[in-house]
């Protein structure tokens, strides 16, 4: 089990990393690329951002930092798209590194912003849970995900799955795509970090211990999904950028049978060391 000193060191390292990103956002640049079907990577080396071309407008998943918005806009345009055409912004959860740029993008495009409802109180009652809320200009949440209904816009279908843990409202996105004339399944888990999930952190944040078991149960359940292409919310969870370089950006190169299960199992193994009590259900 993680000691108090180890926990403090882990959290301090995270904050130092974030502050470095705010100060020098250009160091996070990564060229944009096509993933599969309607899905494009327009994120940076720390936070993934995905652009979906529905044929009836664009959907963007996680705008990332406000400090990297100029990189995001450049990446979208480099692929031949116009940020003005973004109709929906899907947020995976309410942390600064995923939502920081939402206000800029929402005002620029007029897009509707979506969030998992359990995270909504971050933006009304508990800005401390956003982490560095002063780096998140206020934005309007227009819609909450319906976890019982598939979302469709043009040629794109998306299934939303509630996967609480990292935050109460983490949402996982499952998106079919066509590769080589065949339908493959892509998926993005909205938040695999263990930061915030130890019991001392849950106490400090006044959040329920049930988030621990919810997280583990969610990972175990998601392992059953026959995912062909992993869309990582962070590249350190799964090296999509490495696969892009390895396979020259070819769609087939992102197909990785078992990659989804391996990624989730790796997080479960971390849970056994950091939050072993999460398995007591």
Regions found by a protein language model. Give the residues of each.
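Short, surface-exposed connector motifs at secondary-structure boundaries
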Residues: 54-58, 82-86, 154-156
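Metallo-beta-lactamase
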Residues: 14-20, 28-30, 34-36, 58, 65-67, 85, 148-152, 157-247, ...
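Active-site HxH/HxHxD metal-binding segment of metal-dependent hydrolases
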Residues: 39, 67-70, 77-150, 249-250, ...
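C-terminal regulatory/interaction regions
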Residues: 3, 255-281
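Divalent metal-coordination and catalytic microenvironments
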Residues: 38, 52, 62, 93, ...
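Conserved beta-strand hairpin/beta-sheet module of binuclear metal-dependent hydrolase folds
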Residues: 25-79, 172-194
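N-terminal non-globular leader segments, chiefly Sec-dependent signal peptides
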Residues: 1-17
């Amino acid at each position: 089990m993680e000691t108090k000193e180890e926990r403090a060191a882990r959290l301090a390292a995270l904050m130092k990393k974030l502050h470095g990103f705010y100060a020098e956002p250009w160091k996070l640049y990564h060229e944009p690329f096509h993933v599969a079907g309607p899905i494009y990577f327009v994120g940076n080396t720390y936070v993934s951002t995905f652009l979906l071309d529905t044929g009836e407008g664009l959907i963007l998943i996680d705008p990332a930092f406000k400090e990297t918005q100029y990189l995001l806009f450049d990446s979208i345009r480099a692929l031949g798209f116009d940020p003005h055409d973004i109709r929906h912004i899907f947020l995976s959860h309410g942390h600064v590194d995923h939502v920081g740029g939402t206000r800029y993008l929402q005002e620029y495009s007029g897009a509707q912003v979506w969030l998992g409802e359990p995270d909504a109180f971050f933006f009304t009652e508990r800005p401390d849970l956003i982490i560095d809320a002063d780096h998140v200009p206020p934005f309007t949440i227009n819609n909450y995900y319906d976890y019982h209904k598939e979302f469709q816009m043009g040629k794109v279908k998306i299934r939303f799955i509630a996967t609480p843990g990292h935050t109460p409202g983490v949402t996982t996105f499952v998106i079919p795509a066509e590769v080589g004339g065949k339908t493959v399944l892509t998926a993005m888990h909205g938040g695999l970090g263990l930061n915030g999930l130890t019991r001392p952190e849950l106490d400090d944040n006044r959040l329920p211990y049930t988030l621990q078991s919810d997280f583990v149960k969610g990972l175990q359940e998601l392992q059953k999904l026959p995912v062909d292409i992993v869309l990582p919310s962070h590249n350190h969870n799964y090296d999509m950028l490495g696969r892009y370089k390895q396979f020259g950006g070819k769609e087939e190169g992102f197909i990785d049978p078992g990659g989804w299960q391996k990624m989730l199992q790796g997080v479960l193994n971390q849970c056994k060391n950091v939050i072993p009590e999460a398995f007591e259900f």
